Protein backbone atom coordinates (compact mmCIF):
# COMPACT_ATOMS: atom_id res chain seq x y z
CA UNK A 1 0.00 0.00 0.00
CA UNK A 2 1.07 3.59 -0.42
CA UNK A 3 2.47 5.38 2.55
CA UNK A 4 -0.05 5.95 5.31
CA UNK A 5 2.41 7.24 7.85
CA UNK A 6 1.16 9.83 10.28
CA UNK A 7 2.18 13.46 9.91
CA UNK A 8 5.58 14.23 11.39
CA UNK A 9 5.43 15.13 15.05
CA UNK A 10 7.10 18.08 16.72
CA UNK A 11 9.15 15.75 18.92
CA UNK A 12 12.77 14.94 18.09
CA UNK A 13 12.98 11.80 15.92
CA UNK A 14 13.77 8.56 17.68
CA UNK A 15 17.34 7.37 17.09
CA UNK A 16 17.91 4.87 14.31
CA UNK A 17 18.55 1.42 15.66
CA UNK A 18 20.41 -0.93 13.32
CA UNK A 19 22.62 1.40 11.34
CA UNK A 20 22.41 4.41 13.62
CA UNK A 21 21.74 7.83 12.21
CA UNK A 22 24.43 8.70 9.69
CA UNK A 23 25.83 5.22 10.27
CA UNK A 24 27.82 3.09 7.93
CA UNK A 25 31.55 3.37 7.45
CA UNK A 26 31.90 1.59 4.15
CA UNK A 27 31.35 3.26 0.80
CA UNK A 28 29.72 6.64 1.37
CA UNK A 29 30.24 8.02 -2.10
CA UNK A 30 27.19 8.95 -4.08
CA UNK A 31 25.76 6.54 -6.61
CA UNK A 32 25.62 8.22 -10.03
CA UNK A 33 22.18 9.14 -11.27
CA UNK A 34 23.13 8.20 -14.82
CA UNK A 35 24.98 5.08 -15.88
CA UNK A 36 27.82 5.26 -18.38
CA UNK A 37 26.67 1.89 -19.68
CA UNK A 38 23.75 3.59 -21.40
CA UNK A 39 26.03 5.58 -23.72
CA UNK A 40 26.74 4.50 -27.26
CA UNK A 41 30.22 3.21 -27.98
CA UNK A 42 31.69 5.95 -30.18
CA UNK A 43 34.61 3.82 -31.34
CA UNK A 44 32.77 0.98 -33.01
CA UNK A 45 29.34 2.57 -33.36
CA UNK A 46 27.60 -0.14 -31.38
CA UNK A 47 24.39 0.97 -29.72
CA UNK A 48 24.23 -0.03 -26.09
CA UNK A 49 20.98 -1.62 -24.92
CA UNK A 50 18.49 0.66 -23.24
CA UNK A 51 18.61 0.58 -19.44
CA UNK A 52 15.94 -1.53 -17.76
CA UNK A 53 12.86 0.40 -16.73
CA UNK A 54 13.21 -0.61 -13.10
CA UNK A 55 16.80 0.59 -12.64
CA UNK A 56 16.69 3.39 -10.03
CA UNK A 57 19.75 5.04 -11.59
CA UNK A 58 17.76 5.82 -14.76
CA UNK A 59 14.59 7.10 -13.15
CA UNK A 60 13.31 10.52 -14.18
CA UNK A 61 11.36 12.29 -11.42
CA UNK A 62 7.71 13.14 -11.92
CA UNK A 63 7.07 15.47 -8.99
CA UNK A 64 10.48 16.88 -8.08
CA UNK A 65 12.55 19.16 -10.27
CA UNK A 66 15.99 17.94 -11.29
CA UNK A 67 17.64 20.07 -8.59
CA UNK A 68 15.20 18.93 -5.91
CA UNK A 69 15.65 15.30 -6.90
CA UNK A 70 19.43 15.62 -6.76
CA UNK A 71 19.13 16.92 -3.19
CA UNK A 72 16.82 14.02 -2.36
CA UNK A 73 19.25 11.44 -3.74
CA UNK A 74 22.16 12.71 -1.67
CA UNK A 75 20.18 13.38 1.51
CA UNK A 76 18.57 9.93 1.50
CA UNK A 77 21.94 8.29 0.89
CA UNK A 78 23.41 9.99 3.95
CA UNK A 79 20.49 8.85 6.10
CA UNK A 80 20.58 5.28 4.76
CA UNK A 81 24.10 4.77 3.39
CA UNK A 82 25.60 1.80 1.64
CA UNK A 83 27.64 -0.30 4.05
CA UNK A 84 28.75 -3.87 4.69
CA UNK A 85 25.13 -4.89 5.28
CA UNK A 86 23.89 -3.94 1.84
CA UNK A 87 23.02 -1.14 -0.60
CA UNK A 88 22.17 2.41 0.34
CA UNK A 89 19.13 4.52 -0.37
CA UNK A 90 19.95 5.38 -3.98
CA UNK A 91 20.57 1.79 -5.07
CA UNK A 92 17.39 0.77 -3.25
CA UNK A 93 15.35 3.30 -5.24
CA UNK A 94 14.37 5.34 -2.19
CA UNK A 95 14.36 8.72 -4.02
CA UNK A 96 12.17 7.17 -6.72
CA UNK A 97 9.82 5.85 -4.03
CA UNK A 98 9.49 9.30 -2.45
CA UNK A 99 8.99 11.02 -5.80
CA UNK A 100 6.18 8.65 -6.70
CA UNK A 101 4.62 8.96 -3.25
CA UNK A 102 4.30 12.70 -3.78
CA UNK A 103 1.86 12.07 -6.66
CA UNK A 104 -0.55 10.12 -4.44
CA UNK A 105 -3.29 11.25 -2.01
CA UNK A 106 -0.70 10.78 0.74
CA UNK A 107 1.68 13.25 -0.89
CA UNK A 108 -1.09 15.81 -1.36
CA UNK A 109 -2.10 15.53 2.29
CA UNK A 110 -5.50 14.05 1.43
CA UNK A 111 -5.06 11.37 4.10
CA UNK A 112 -4.44 13.91 6.89
CA UNK A 113 -6.80 16.33 8.58
CA UNK A 114 -5.62 19.61 7.08
CA UNK A 115 -8.25 22.16 8.10
CA UNK A 116 -7.75 25.26 10.23
CA UNK A 117 -7.18 26.35 12.89
CA UNK A 118 -3.46 25.63 12.94
CA UNK A 119 -2.07 26.41 16.37
CA UNK A 120 1.05 25.69 18.36
CA UNK A 121 0.30 22.88 20.75
CA UNK A 122 1.94 20.14 22.76
CA UNK A 123 3.34 17.15 20.84
CA UNK A 124 0.58 14.83 22.05
CA UNK A 125 -1.91 16.82 19.96
CA UNK A 126 -0.11 15.72 16.82
CA UNK A 127 0.74 17.54 13.62
CA UNK A 128 -0.41 21.18 13.65
CA UNK A 129 1.01 22.62 10.43
CA UNK A 130 -0.85 23.49 7.20
CA UNK A 131 1.67 21.67 4.99
CA UNK A 132 1.20 18.43 3.08
CA UNK A 133 4.22 16.19 2.38
CA UNK A 134 4.45 17.88 -1.03
CA UNK A 135 4.55 21.27 0.68
CA UNK A 136 7.20 20.18 3.17
CA UNK A 137 9.58 19.02 0.45
CA UNK A 138 8.93 21.95 -1.88
CA UNK A 139 9.19 24.45 0.95
CA UNK A 140 12.36 23.04 2.51
CA UNK A 141 14.74 21.97 -0.24
CA UNK A 142 15.33 25.39 -1.78
CA UNK A 143 16.11 27.11 1.57
CA UNK A 144 18.47 24.25 2.43
CA UNK A 145 20.35 24.70 -0.84
CA UNK A 146 20.42 28.46 -0.27
CA UNK A 147 21.90 27.90 3.19
CA UNK A 148 24.58 25.63 1.69
CA UNK A 149 25.41 28.17 -1.00
CA UNK A 150 25.83 30.93 1.56
CA UNK A 151 28.11 28.88 3.82
CA UNK A 152 29.95 26.63 1.36
CA UNK A 153 29.38 28.17 -2.08
CA UNK A 154 27.78 24.91 -3.24
CA UNK A 155 24.37 23.26 -3.12
CA UNK A 156 23.80 20.35 -0.74
CA UNK A 157 24.43 17.68 -3.37
CA UNK A 158 27.89 19.11 -4.14
CA UNK A 159 29.08 19.15 -0.52
CA UNK A 160 31.41 16.57 0.97
CA UNK A 161 29.73 13.81 2.99
CA UNK A 162 31.02 15.43 6.18
CA UNK A 163 29.33 18.75 5.43
CA UNK A 164 26.17 17.02 4.24
CA UNK A 165 26.02 15.32 7.63
CA UNK A 166 26.44 18.68 9.35
CA UNK A 167 23.50 20.10 7.43
CA UNK A 168 21.31 17.11 8.24
CA UNK A 169 22.22 17.32 11.92
CA UNK A 170 21.28 21.01 11.87
CA UNK A 171 17.93 20.09 10.36
CA UNK A 172 17.36 17.41 12.96
CA UNK A 173 18.22 19.84 15.78
CA UNK A 174 15.84 22.47 14.36
CA UNK A 175 18.72 24.90 13.79
CA UNK A 176 18.05 25.80 10.14
CA UNK A 177 15.59 28.48 9.07
CA UNK A 178 13.23 27.11 6.41
CA UNK A 179 10.77 29.99 6.35
CA UNK A 180 7.65 28.75 8.16
CA UNK A 181 8.62 25.06 8.20
CA UNK A 182 10.40 23.84 11.35
CA UNK A 183 13.52 22.11 10.10
CA UNK A 184 13.08 19.23 12.57
CA UNK A 185 9.63 18.53 11.12
CA UNK A 186 11.06 18.36 7.61
CA UNK A 187 13.91 16.15 8.77
CA UNK A 188 11.49 13.71 10.36
CA UNK A 189 9.43 13.65 7.15
CA UNK A 190 12.56 12.93 5.09
CA UNK A 191 13.87 10.30 7.49
CA UNK A 192 10.51 8.53 7.72
CA UNK A 193 10.03 8.43 3.95
CA UNK A 194 13.61 7.21 3.50
CA UNK A 195 13.03 4.22 5.77
CA UNK A 196 9.66 3.53 4.14
CA UNK A 197 11.32 3.49 0.72
CA UNK A 198 14.09 1.16 1.87
CA UNK A 199 11.66 -1.46 3.15
CA UNK A 200 8.51 -0.95 1.07
CA UNK A 201 7.18 -3.49 -1.37
CA UNK A 202 9.16 -3.02 -4.61
CA UNK A 203 5.90 -2.32 -6.46
CA UNK A 204 6.02 1.18 -4.99
CA UNK A 205 9.45 2.03 -6.39
CA UNK A 206 11.73 1.40 -3.41
CA UNK A 207 13.44 -1.69 -1.99
CA UNK A 208 14.92 -2.43 -5.41
CA UNK A 209 15.45 -6.16 -5.99
CA UNK A 210 14.02 -6.64 -2.47
CA UNK A 211 17.50 -5.89 -1.14
CA UNK A 212 16.05 -4.14 1.91
CA UNK A 213 14.08 -7.24 2.82
CA UNK A 214 17.05 -9.50 2.14
CA UNK A 215 19.16 -7.52 4.61
CA UNK A 216 16.59 -8.37 7.29
CA UNK A 217 15.69 -11.90 6.11
CA UNK A 218 12.12 -10.69 5.70
CA UNK A 219 10.02 -13.12 3.59
CA UNK A 220 7.83 -10.47 2.00
CA UNK A 221 4.33 -11.17 0.78
CA UNK A 222 4.57 -14.96 0.52
CA UNK A 223 1.08 -16.40 0.96
CA UNK A 224 1.75 -19.76 2.60
CA UNK A 225 3.98 -20.58 5.58
CA UNK A 226 2.15 -23.71 6.73
CA UNK A 227 5.12 -26.00 6.12
CA UNK A 228 7.27 -23.92 8.50
CA UNK A 229 4.97 -23.24 11.43
CA UNK A 230 6.26 -26.01 13.71
CA UNK A 231 9.91 -26.01 12.64
CA UNK A 232 11.28 -24.05 15.58
CA UNK A 233 14.87 -22.93 15.03
CA UNK A 234 14.98 -24.04 11.40
CA UNK A 235 16.31 -21.47 8.97
CA UNK A 236 13.70 -20.37 6.45
CA UNK A 237 15.30 -21.14 3.07
CA UNK A 238 13.08 -19.22 0.65
CA UNK A 239 13.76 -15.71 -0.57
CA UNK A 240 11.32 -12.81 -0.28
CA UNK A 241 8.31 -12.40 -2.52
CA UNK A 242 6.78 -9.07 -3.52
CA UNK A 243 3.31 -8.13 -4.67
CA UNK A 244 2.32 -8.87 -8.26
CA UNK A 245 3.34 -5.95 -10.50
CA UNK A 246 -0.25 -5.51 -11.68
CA UNK A 247 -2.29 -3.51 -10.98
CA UNK A 248 0.09 -0.59 -10.85
CA UNK A 249 -0.25 0.84 -7.31
CA UNK A 250 0.26 4.32 -8.75
CA UNK A 251 -2.49 4.03 -11.36
CA UNK A 252 -5.50 6.31 -11.00
CA UNK A 253 -7.88 3.37 -10.61
CA UNK A 254 -5.81 1.84 -7.79
CA UNK A 255 -5.51 5.18 -6.00
CA UNK A 256 -9.26 5.73 -6.23
CA UNK A 257 -9.91 2.29 -4.75
CA UNK A 258 -7.53 2.97 -1.84
CA UNK A 259 -9.07 6.35 -1.16
Indicate residue ranges for each PLM-predicted region.
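Mature-region segments of soluble proteins
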Residues: 2-9, 13, 56-58, 64-74, ...
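N-terminal secretory signal peptides and thylakoid transit peptides that target proteins
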Residues: 8-29
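Hydrophobic alpha-helical segments, especially transmembrane helices
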Residues: 19-20, 37, 165, 192
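Boundary at the C-terminal end of the N-terminal hydrophobic targeting segment
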Residues: 35-42
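N-terminal pre-domain segments of enzymes
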Residues: 46-57
